[in-house]
Every structure is written in structure tokens, then in C-alpha cells.
Amino acid sequence: EISECLVGSEMCIRDRLIERTRQSFFEGIKYAKAGNHLHEISAAIGDYAESFGYGVVTDLVGHGIGTHLHEEPEIPNFRQVRRGIKLRQGMTLAIEPMINEGRPDVEWLGDDWTVVTEDSSLSAHYENTILITDGEPEILTLTDKELESM
């Protein structure tokens, strides 16, 4: 239980980051409805994470999913000036907040796959695929354990 952590302990800091990254996903998908704009999801994720002083990764984003795993649109996890596309019923999107305990900057290691924070701070990533509907979005990738806890 996060509320039972010792203040300032590494485990407490880690657990809070993980839970808040997860919650930022749910804050974002409150706006994942047909007729809304993509930036509303992005802004909600970023605003929530930044309210705790976290760095929101800007070099990696969520994406559309269709006949290919990674498709347009790109879905940032931070507030943008542009509104982005209007969401349509039937769209499938991978919403994946990536939040750092420290600065938002990341770098790729020599294997061109592993991503680490530039300041060596802790980082968390939470991802699910959603289906846009006229009402609440449908989360397509929740685990059985997550479904039980909701």
C-alpha cells in the first residue's frame, strides 16, 4: 500500500511514480470520446503528471493501431498548441504515458532499443489500447488482475 511507505524511501518514490503514471492514463482517457480532439487526452496526461513535479517524456509517444502496430496518429503525453485530430468512433489507440521522476529527457543506449533517463532518474511506462466509441472508451488490453481491481 502506497500510503504505508516511509516518506522519502526509494520504494515509496518508485511505487508512487508507477501508480501516478498508471493514473495519468486514466486521466487521459476521460477525454477519449468520439468528437473530442486528440490534444485533450495528451493535455490531461501531461497536466496530471506535471502536477506532481514529474518530467513527461516528449521523445516517445503513443500511437494509432490498425493493420500495423504503429500507425498515425502519434499521441503525445503532454500539452500541445495544436488541437490534433478529431477522434472518431472505431479508432484504436495505444495510450502510453511515460513519466520520469526527474527531467523529461531520455537517451537510447547502443543497442538502439533500450531507453534510459538522461539524469538516471526513475521512469515508469503504462500502456493500454483503447477503442473510441460514442460514449466511454473501451479498454481492450486490461489484464484480468486489473479488471478485478476496478
PLM regions with names:
Residues G8, R22, G62, T92:
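ATP/adenylate-binding site constellation spanning eukaryotic-like Ser/Thr protein kinases
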Residues E1-G8, C12-I13:
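Single conserved hydrophobic/aromatic residue that forms the stacking wall/gate
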Residues S9-E10, R79-M150:
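Charged, cofactor-coupling segments
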Residues H70-R79:
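Short, structured beta-strand/loop micro-motifs enriched in basic residues and often containing a Trp
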Residues R16-L17, E118:
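Short alpha-helix boundary/capping segments
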Residues A32-H70, I85-M91, G102-V106, G135, ...:
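Active-site cores enriched in adjacent His and Asp/Glu residues with nearby glycine-rich loops
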